[in-house]
Amino acid sequence: MAIRSEVEHWDVVIVGAGIAGLAAAIALRKDGRSILVLEKSSMNKEVGALISLQPNASKIVDGWNMQQFLAEKKPMVDEAFRLLNVEGKLQVEMKLNTSQFGADRMLYHRQDLHDALRQAATSDDMPGSPAVIRTSSGVTGCDCESGTVYLSNGSSVQGSVVIGADGIRSAIRDEVIKGSASEGSKAIPTGLSAYRILVETDKLPKLEVSEDVFDLKRSATTMIVGHDKRIIMGPGRGGEMFGLVCLVPDPNPDGEGTSWNNPAPLEEVLEAFKAFPAWVRDIMSQAPDVALWQLRDIDPLTTWTKGRAILIGDAAHAMLPTQGQGASQSIEDAEALQAFLSDSDSKSSGDEVHAQLQAIVSARYERASLIQAYSRLQAKPAASKDNKTVQLNPQEFMEYNCNYSGAKDWAKRQREAEEMAYKQTAARA
C-alpha cells in the first residue's frame, strides 16, 4: 500500500503510556493536533522503584515548563556519584553539578515521575490540546503506511503519525521491522538479573557506617561493586524513600522472567550479597518485599521507522540500566519528535511525514545505539575476583552521554565533526 498523500487531520497516535509515550505526548502538544495515547494496562499501579533523569534529559524536561507538576513530587538533585568496593572503601567520588552539562541529574520515585508526565500530557495548562489517554487498550499491530492501529478488541484508530512507545515487547516494532534485516528481532536475556528493593527511610535502623563512607541523608547515588555483583542505591521522594538495584548473574537465563514483579525471598538477596558490607545488608533486611527482574535488551535494529510509524524508547533501543540512561534516552526521543515534527500539520503529506521520521532516526540512531553498547560494556565484571580492586570507571562515558542539547544540535555537531575529519583526511592525502 502506498503512503497516502492527504489526511484530513493531523492526529498523533501514541502506543504505550510509559515514560516514553507520555514524554512524546507532552513534546507533540500543539494547536491543531489531537493526541491519543493507547495503553494496554489500567494505569492504576506504576512500578515501585527509584529512577534518575540524567542531565541530558533533565535539560529537555526543564524546557517543557512542567515544574508545576514535578515540584510536588519532591524530586532530588543528585549531588555526587560514589563508588565503593565490597569492603566499603571509597574508590571514586564524582561530584555532579549543573554547570558541567547545563542541568542536574535528578532522582525520582518512578511512580511520581510517571504521574507528573501524565499530568503534563493531559493538563489544560500546557500548550496545545490535552492528550487523551485510553487505558485497557491493547494494540496488536498497525498498518505503517496508512497509520492504522489495530486494537485487541477488534477496533482500529488512524493517525497521521504513529509513535510506537510500547516497550521492550513492542507490537509496533514487529510491524516496523517486517521485511527488514531485523525482522523477528526480540528482547534477549543479557545474563543479568536485578533485585529491586524500596524501603521507607524512617524505618531503617541506625547504620554502623561512617558518614564519610555512606550518609543515608545525603542526596547522592552510591554503587558498591563486586566481581560479578553490584548494588546501585540512592534516595528518592525528598529522602522519604531509599531504593536499591542489586545486579546478579541471571539464575535462569532461559526463563521468561520479564516481569518487574517476580517475587523473591529476602533471604535469597542477603545470601547473594553476603560478601558486601553489613550496613548495606541492614538496609536490605528492611525490605517489605523484593522483586526479581530479568534484564533484557535488544540488538540495534536496522530501522526504527516505516511509513507513518516510528519507534521510540525501549521499543527502539531497550538497554541495560548500568548507565541509568534508559528513561533519559526516551526523553531524548520525545524531544527529537518535537524538533523534527514542529511544522507537521494537516497539510503534511504522508511522504513529508515519513521524510521527517527518517530525519529523526538519522539524528538519533547512532547515539542511542552507542549508549546501548556502552551500557552492555558497563555491565561486565567490574572488580577483580577477590573483590578488592574496582576496575569500573564511571566517568568513561559521562561526557558523551550528558553533553547534549537536543537532536538538531547533535546532528549539527556530528555533521561538523564529519566535515572536519574529511578535511583532515584530504589534507594528509
Positions of predicted regions on the chain:
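C-terminal helical "tail/cap" subdomain of flavin- and related membrane-associated enzymes
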Residues: 2-9, 80-83, 87-88, 323-324, ...
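Conserved N-terminal helical subregion
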Residues: 2-12, 29, 54-200, 251-267, ...
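Residues at the starts of beta-strands that form the adenosine-phosphate
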Residues: 11, 34, 241
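Conserved mid-domain beta->alpha element of the FAD-binding
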Residues: 14-32, 36-41, 163-164, 195, ...
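Acidic/histidine metal-binding catalytic segments
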Residues: 73-74, 132, 274-289, 349-358, ...
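Short Gly/Pro-enriched turn/cap motifs at secondary-structure boundaries
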Residues: 185-187, 220-224
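Short helix-loop capping/hinge motifs at secondary-structure junctions, enriched
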Residues: 202-209
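FAD/FMN-dependent oxidoreductases across multiple families
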Residues: 215-219, 226-231, 235-240, 246-323
